[in-house]
Amino acid sequence: MKHLTEMVRQHKAGKTNAIYAVCSAHPLVLEAAIRYASANQTPLLIEATSNQVDQFGGYTGMTPADFRGFVCQLADSLNFPQDALILGGDHLGPNRWQNLPAAQAMANADDLIKSYVAAGFKKIHLDCSMSCQDDPIPLTDDIVAERAARLAKVAEETCLEHFGEADLEYVIGTEVPVPGGAHETLSELAVTTPDAARATLEAHRHAFEKQGLNAIWPRIIALVVQPGVEFDHTNVIDYQPAKASALSQMVENYETLIFEAHSTDYQTPQSLRQLVIDHFAILKVGPALTFALREALFSLAAIEEELVPAKVCSGLRQVLEDVMLDRPEYWQSHYHGDGNARRLARGYSYSDRVRYYWPDSQIDDAFAHLVRNLADSPIPLPLISQYLPLQYVKVRSGELQPTPRELIINHIQDILAQYHTACEGQ
C-alpha cells in the first residue's frame, strides 16, 4: 500500500494533488467518509489521535487494534476495499503522559507506537514536542528529534516483526497551538518560518542517522507546520497565502517531502485549494465533520418538535445539555464567560467539545429515539427546506432519500466534498 508516497510523488511532479485525513471515531462520520470515498473511487485516510486511541483505551475506550477492527468492519459492511483504506496515528509520542517524568512517559510512548504499528496503522506521526514533568520548557529541537528517532526505531522493528517488511510512512514536526483547536480567542497566528522548518528537518535527519535509520528518510513524507490556519470557539483564521509563501517555496527543495496542515476545519473551499497548491498536501479535518453531524442532529430535533407530541419527543437537545452539565470535564476548561456564553458554546462552538459526548449511553438512546420518531412517516418537504436547505435541493432532485440517517450522512458529506475538490489536483 503506497497511496501516500505515490500522492507525494505526483504532487512533486506538479499535479497539485493532495489527500485529506478524516480525524474522527464517530460511526456516522466514518460511514459518511467511507461512502463518499467509495462513490468517488478514491483512497481514504482515517486517523486516530493519541488522545482518542491508545494501548490503554484512550477516551474512546479503544486500543489501536480495536479501532482498526471497528473501521475495517464498517468498511466491509459498505463494500469498501481494505487496500484503499489507510490508517494513521496522529501526535504519537508522550502527549498523554506529560505529567509523568520523561523516562516513564517515553516508555509509554514506545508501547503506544508498538500498539499502533502492530495493529496495521501505516501512517505514523511522530510528535515528541511536548515537555514532560522533569523537562525544560520548551524542549530543544535536538531533544524532540532524538525522541522521535527512538520511536521511529521502535516502529520499524515492530513493523518488521509483525509484517515482515518495513513499509511505514512517517510525518514529523508539530503545529502550534495544541491539537484540537485553540483554547483561547485568536486574532492572528504566527506562520512557521522556513528557518524553523529547516531546523526541525535537520535535527530529525541527524537524530535518525544516529539511530542507523538513514534508509527510511524517503518514507518521511510530510512535515507538520503552521501555515497560519486555526479556529477557536467562534472565529476562523483564514489562510493568507502571502504570509506562507516563503514556507511554501522552502519545501520545493526537498524532493520527497510535502507539508501536513492541521486544524484546516472551517477554511473556505478556496483556502483549502490554495493550501494544496502551496504544498500543504495533507489536510487534516475532524471537528468540522462532527460539527456538521451536530448541525444535522439539531435540525432533525427541531423537525421532531414540529411533528411529534412533546411527551414522546426524544428531547435530544436537553439530554445533551444535561449530560454535559453533569460531566463537564471535556468542556469546562475550554469554554469561558457567563452562563449564557457557556451554554451557547456547549451547543454551537467551532471547537465542538460536544463531540466527546456522543458515545454517552443516555445521549445515544436519545439519538436512536429521534431517528425512530422521524422514520415512522415521511418528513414533510417544507420542514426539510426550513432546517436542512442544502439537503432539500438534493431530495427534490431525487438524488437523496429524505430519511433521518441519509440526511445526516449527506450533511457531513457536504464538508467532505470541499476537501475532495481541493485535493483532486490537475
Curated annotation (Swiss-Prot):
Q: Which GO terms describe its cellular component?
A: plasma membrane
InterPro entries cross-referenced by the UniProt entry? Aldolase_TIM, GatZ/KbaZ-like, GatZ_KbaZ_carbometab, TagBP_ald_KbaZ
The UniProt entry, under Pfam families, shows:
GatZ_KbaZ-like (PF08013)
Q: Name one GO biological process term.
A: phosphoenolpyruvate-dependent sugar phosphotransferase system
Q: Which domain of life is it from?
A: Bacteria
Pathway field of the UniProt record reads:
Carbohydrate metabolism; D-tagatose 6-phosphate degradation; D-glyceraldehyde 3-phosphate and glycerone phosphate from D-tagatose 6-phosphate: step 2/2
What's the stated role of this polypeptide? Component of the tagatose-1,6-bisphosphate aldolase KbaYZ that is required for full activity and stability of the Y subunit. Could have a chaperone-like function for the proper and stable folding of KbaY. When expressed alone, KbaZ does not show any aldolase activity.
Q: Which protein family is it in?
A: Belongs to the GatZ/KbaZ family. KbaZ subfamily.
Describe, as the record does, how this protein assembles with itself and its partners.
Answer: Forms a complex with KbaY.
- Matching NCBIfam families: agaZ_gatZ, PRK15458.1
The name this protein goes by in its record: D-tagatose-1,6-bisphosphate aldolase subunit KbaZ
State the organism named in the record. Answer: Escherichia coli O9:H4 (strain HS)
Q: In the UniProt record, what gene is named as encoding this protein?
A: kbaZ
